[in-house]
Amino acid sequence: MSKEIYAIHPPWLRVTHWLYVVAVVILVMSGWRIYDASPFFPFFIPKEITLGGWLGGALQWHFAAMWLLAVNGLIYLFFNIFSGRLWHKFFPLSLRAIVADLLDALKGKLSHADLSHYNALQRAAYLFAIADIIVIVLSGLVLWKSVQFPILRELLGGYEAARRVHFIGMSALVAFVGVHVAMVALVPRTLIAMIRGH
């Protein structure tokens, strides 16, 4: 069997995956500290799980990690699109297949024997995560450079609405990561495949 066929995850995918982990952890933890400086919901994030110590420090961490996320994301999309992996791994996808796989998962009958193949639930979840990160980036641009992106700001309903979109997008990503980590705990060889490639 050739190495190309045997490999489940190519090197570029593994590298971008782990860079995403670093970027998302930094962005979420520093973002929580930024939120605490001016909350719009009736709660605060515990300081112990935030990053930056104070607003200025949190902003520095956030701005540094946003570049990592952006560059890494472009590399990820480039390789996924031009290698054909995006179409091969995530499509076709139908609502019927998603519902069927969801019901199987709830019954504990969803198979994950072939790590090289994504089931419909995985395809939908990963496509959701990609779309969610795009929404987070676009709303983040409004928060970072509101004057330079007036059309985007208005499309999102204004600066304050963009803050909420950004926070809700982050919350959805954290929920995705939580489910993703739980699934990895249930099928540990997926972690080995993401480290070694097979």
Swiss-Prot record:
<feature type="transmembrane region" description="Helical">
    <location>
        <begin position="63"/>
        <end position="83"/>
    </location>
</feature>
<keyword id="KW-0997">Cell inner membrane</keyword>
<feature type="transmembrane region" description="Helical">
    <location>
        <begin position="167"/>
        <end position="187"/>
    </location>
</feature>
<keyword id="KW-1003">Cell membrane</keyword>
<comment type="similarity">
    <text>Belongs to the HupC/HyaC/HydC family.</text>
</comment>
<feature type="transmembrane region" description="Helical">
    <location>
        <begin position="124"/>
        <end position="144"/>
    </location>
</feature>
<dbReference type="Pfam" id="PF01292">
    <property type="entry name" value="Ni_hydr_CYTB"/>
</dbReference>
<dbReference type="GO" id="GO:0022904">
    <property type="term" value="P:respiratory electron transport chain"/>
</dbReference>
<keyword id="KW-1133">Transmembrane helix</keyword>
<dbReference type="InterPro" id="IPR011577">
    <property type="entry name" value="Cyt_b561_bac/Ni-Hgenase"/>
</dbReference>
<dbReference type="GO" id="GO:0020037">
    <property type="term" value="F:heme binding"/>
</dbReference>
<keyword id="KW-0812">Transmembrane</keyword>
<feature type="transmembrane region" description="Helical">
    <location>
        <begin position="12"/>
        <end position="32"/>
    </location>
</feature>
<keyword id="KW-0346">Stress response</keyword>
<dbReference type="GO" id="GO:0009055">
    <property type="term" value="F:electron transfer activity"/>
</dbReference>
<keyword id="KW-0472">Membrane</keyword>
<comment type="function">
    <text>Part of the YedY1-YedZ1 system that may repair oxidized proteins containing methionine sulfoxide residues (Met-O).</text>
</comment>
<dbReference type="InterPro" id="IPR051542">
    <property type="entry name" value="Hydrogenase_cytochrome"/>
</dbReference>
<protein>
    <recommendedName>
        <fullName>Putative protein-methionine-sulfoxide reductase subunit YedZ1</fullName>
    </recommendedName>
</protein>
<dbReference type="InterPro" id="IPR016174">
    <property type="entry name" value="Di-haem_cyt_TM"/>
</dbReference>
<dbReference type="GO" id="GO:0005886">
    <property type="term" value="C:plasma membrane"/>
</dbReference>
